[in-house]
Amino acid sequence: MFKEFKTFIMRGNVLDMAVGIIIGAAFGKIVTSFVTDVLTPVLSLGMGKVDFSNLFFVLNGDSYPTLDAAKAAGVATLNYGTFLNVVLDFVIVAFSIFLIIKAANKLKRAEEPAPVTTKECPECCSSIPMKARKCAHCGSAVAS
């Protein structure tokens, strides 16, 4: 059982996927920090708000100065500011991945065409092997 597991893990695609997941998680943390610590404060200055994460609606109609105060009171809230942060995070990650894939596709070499292994018989237009001297379909002689 251990041998099968080792064989499974050592396959190239499993290791590649593991590395991709680890790098993706680290990249996600960088983007989250960028959204939370850099982008959101700049955007909130333009909107006159200090912090997106403090944008919320109290569903029972009461008023609370902060989201933490509303949570401490145990009321139901609609936290649209936190949602906006997550949406910004997703958009930046998705766009970054798009740019990376686009760059990788440009760097990817075009695959070489497969070697030609057949030719056409001049008499019957059938496909025959390149080394054939006689057509298997019509029997006519074919120049090599």
From Swiss-Prot:
SUPFAM superfamilies xrefs: Gated mechanosensitive channel (SSF81330)
Protein name: Large-conductance mechanosensitive channel
Places the protein is found: Cell inner membrane
Keywords: Cell inner membrane, Cell membrane, Ion channel, Ion transport, Membrane, Transmembrane, Transmembrane helix, Transport
Record organism: Bdellovibrio bacteriovorus (strain ATCC 15356 / DSM 50701 / NCIMB 9529 / HD100)
PANTHER family to which the protein is assigned, alphabetical: LARGE-CONDUCTANCE MECHANOSENSITIVE CHANNEL (PTHR30266:SF2), MECHANOSENSITIVE CHANNEL MSCL (PTHR30266)
Parts of the chain that traverse the membrane: 14-34, 81-101
InterPro entries, A to Z: Mechanosensitive_channel_CS (IPR019823), MS_channel (IPR001185), MSC/AndL (IPR037673), MscL_channel (IPR036019)
Pfam name, any one: MscL
GO cellular component labels: plasma membrane
Its membrane topology: Multi-pass membrane protein
Family, as annotated: Belongs to the MscL family.
Functional summary from the UniProt entry: Channel that opens in response to stretch forces in the membrane lipid bilayer. May participate in the regulation of osmotic pressure changes within the cell.
GO MF annotation, one: mechanosensitive monoatomic ion channel activity
